[in-house]
C-alpha cells in the first residue's frame, strides 16, 4: 500500500511526494501547476537542471484550462555542472570527463545506462498516481536526459499516452526501443533537435525520427540551427503540436 502523498502549497504551485509503490523505489517529487486537468503535460528536466527551473515553462505553453502541468524532480541531487552546482539528474553522468577526452557528442544508441530503468519506473509510478496525474489524456515529454527517460517509459511500458515530446534527446538502447516502436503505432511524437548539438548528436535524433515514422508513429520533426538548446522556434512549434492534438 502506498503512503499518502504529502502536499505543500507555495503560490500557484503544489509540491507532492509520492511513494515508490511495490518496487520500493525512493519517492519522486513534482511541481504541479495550472488547472486540475485533464489534459496533463508531464515534462522531465535535463541533466543538471531541476523541476523549479522548468516550472516557469508553463508561461510559454498556450494550453487552455483545465490543463495541468507536472514537472517531476530528478532523483539524484547535487549534480555539479559547468553552470549549475545545485542541479539534479535522472542518473549520474560524467560529461566533464567525456568532453575532456575529446570524444565530442556521445553516441548512446547501444548503451543501457544503469539508472535508466529505475528512473523510468519512478516516472511510471508518478503517472499512475491520480492525485498528481488525473485520469485522462497525458502528454509525456522531456529535455535531454529527461527525454531519454520519457522515451524509455513510452517504448518499454504500457502506460497510456496521448503523445510523446522529445526535446534534444537521443536514441538509447536502440535495439530494444526499436523492437517496441510498433506497439505505439499512431502515437503523435514531437521531436526537436539542433543541427549543431555537441552534447547529443543530431544524426541519432534524425535516425530516431526515421525509425519512428517507419513504425507508423505520427512524427512532427522540428530540426533547428543551433546547439543543445530549445529556441523560441521550438516552443512555437510545440504549441502548434499540442493544439493539433485537440485533447
Give residue spans per PLM region.
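Bacterial N-terminal signal peptides that target proteins for export
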Residues: 1-9
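Bacterial Sec-dependent signal peptides at the C-terminal "C-region" and cleavage site
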Residues: 13-26
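Serine-hydrolase catalytic machinery in alpha/beta-hydrolase-like enzymes
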Residues: 24-135
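Conserved alpha/beta-hydrolase "nucleophile elbow" surrounding the catalytic nucleophile
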Residues: 45-47, 138-143, 194
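Residue in the alpha/beta-hydrolase core beta-strand immediately N-terminal to the catalytic nucleophile
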Residues: 139, 163-165
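Gly/Ala-rich beta-loop-alpha elbow adjacent to hydrolase catalytic centers
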Residues: 142-146, 150
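Conserved hydrolase catalytic core segment
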Residues: 152-163
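The feature captures the conserved acid-bearing segment of alpha/beta-hydrolase catalytic domains
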Residues: 166-244
Amino acid at each position: 500500500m502506498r503512503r499518502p502523498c504529502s502536499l505543500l502549497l507555495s503560490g500557484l504551485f503544489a509540491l507532492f511526494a509520492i511513494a515508490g509503490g511495490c518496487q520500493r523505489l525512493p519517492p519522486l517529487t513534482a511541481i504541479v501547476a495550472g488547472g486540475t486537468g485533464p489534459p496533463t503535460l508531464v515534462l522531465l528536466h535535463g541533466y543538471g537542471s531541476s523541476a523549479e527551473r522548468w516550472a516557469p515553462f508553463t508561461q510559454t505553453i498556450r494550453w487552455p484550462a483545465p490543463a495541468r502541468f507536472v514537472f517531476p524532480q530528478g532523483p539524484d541531487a547535487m549534480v555539479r555542472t559547468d553552470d549549475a552546482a545545485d542541479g539534479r539528474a535522472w542518473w549520474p553522468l560524467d560529461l566533464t570527463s567525456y568532453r575532456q577526452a575529446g570524444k565530442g557528442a556521445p553516441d548512446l544508441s547501444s548503451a543501457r545506462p544503469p539508472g535508466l530503468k529505475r528512473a523510468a519506473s519512478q516516472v511510471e509510478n508518478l503517472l499512475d498516481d491520480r492525485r498528481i496525474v488525473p485520469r485522462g489524456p497525458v502528454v509525456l515529454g522531456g529535455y535531454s536526459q529527461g527525454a531519454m527517460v520519457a522515451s524509455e517509459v513510452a517504448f518499454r511500458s504500457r502506460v497510456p499516452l496521448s503523445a510523446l515530446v522529445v526535446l534534444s534527446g537521443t536514441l538509447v538502447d536502440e535495439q530494444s526501443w526499436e523492437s517496441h516502436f510498433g506497439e505505439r503505432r499512431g502515437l503523435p511524437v514531437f521531436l526537436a533537435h539542433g543541427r549543431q548539438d555537441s552534447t547529443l548528436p543530431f544524426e541519432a535524433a534524425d535516425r530516431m525520427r526515421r525509425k519512428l515514422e517507419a513504425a507508423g508513429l505520427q512524427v512532427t520533426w522540428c530540426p533547428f540551427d543551433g546547439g543543445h538548446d530549445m529556441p523560441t522556434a521550438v516552443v512555437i512549434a510545440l504549441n502548434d503540436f499540442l493544439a493539433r492534438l485537440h485533447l
